[in-house]
Amino acid sequence: MSHDLVERLRALQPKSKFFIGIDSDGCVFDTMEIKQKQCFHPVIIRHWNFEAIAPYVRETAQFVNLYSRWRGTNRFPALDMTFDLLRQRPEVQQSGVDVPELTSLKRWMREESRLGNPALEAKVKESGDPELEKILEWSLEVNRTIEEVVHGVESFDFVRESLNKAGQRADLLVVSQTPLEALEREWKEHAMDGLVAMIAGQEHGTKTEHLEYAASGKYAKDHILMIGDAPGDLKAAQANDALFYPVLPGEETRSWEKFYREGLDRFFEGTYAGAYQEERIEEFDRRLPSVPPWSKSS
């Protein structure tokens, strides 16, 4: 299945001179906080019996997934990083709760580029690894919980206007590490799926691969733009020599209004690269720390 999805990305042909990739969770839709706090983190606590250290699990997982330079990371590396940080916390060490090393997960992530449930299911069937099976069960329950909990969460203001305006001169692609099923459901629920040429999720590969397959070599480099709210979006753009427009966490509406009123026009006019883009990225970098707040205070 993943191979077919990748081939669909590769087969996309330009209909316009410009290309824009758009992240979804926390960028287009205000879903990131509710998904993490009400779906991902409670299921972690339940699956690994972390009730005794639940406050530290929530704080650590929120730092990794929402309030740090790792914001927007694929769920599997984010889980691994959360566990690594938990093991370093004195409160967790003193609790006597065992936080697994996730050795099998680390090995699988080194071997696999399409970090999604289909690839993990295949690995579990092939290996019978109990650690990977537990992580797969967690991931599947997260998806079920999201489907039950996340409904009616609107897009940020100025998103729809921006995409309508952008689509007049650019080919648009959703570039996300959310599972495809959830992406398609959310974009369709808000009647926005028709605004983009295609929706790419974690089953299509990394965000860097999405841009590479869909845009690199098909458009002039300064005609390719990635819009995102996380450092991974910036890295994907830089890896493909593309431009980047950041949606600032906590100031999403202001970011989209600025894009609608000036950023998009600059992109089409060829004046986005250079000082204007650098200012946007510098402001973005200041928002997301790499050191956890509990490390600073200890």
Regions found by a protein language model. Name each.
Residues 1, 57-65, 259-263:
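Short, Φ-rich (hydrophobic/aromatic) sequence segments
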Residues 2, 151-171, 178-298:
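C-terminal cap/substrate-recognition subdomain and adjoining C-terminal extension
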Residues 2-11:
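A short, compositionally biased domain-edge/stem linker segment
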Residues 9, 63, 79-82, 101-112, ...:
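Generic structural signal of hydrophobic/aromatic residues within well-ordered alpha-helices
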Residues 13-15, 219:
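Residue-level detector of transmembrane insertion/anchoring sites
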Residues 15-17, 27-181:
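Alpha-helical substrate-recognition element adjacent to the catalytic core
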Residues 18-20, 224:
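The start of beta-strands in P-loop NTPase/AAA+ ATPase cores
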Residues 23:
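Short, acidic, Ser/Thr-enriched surface-loop or helix-capping motifs
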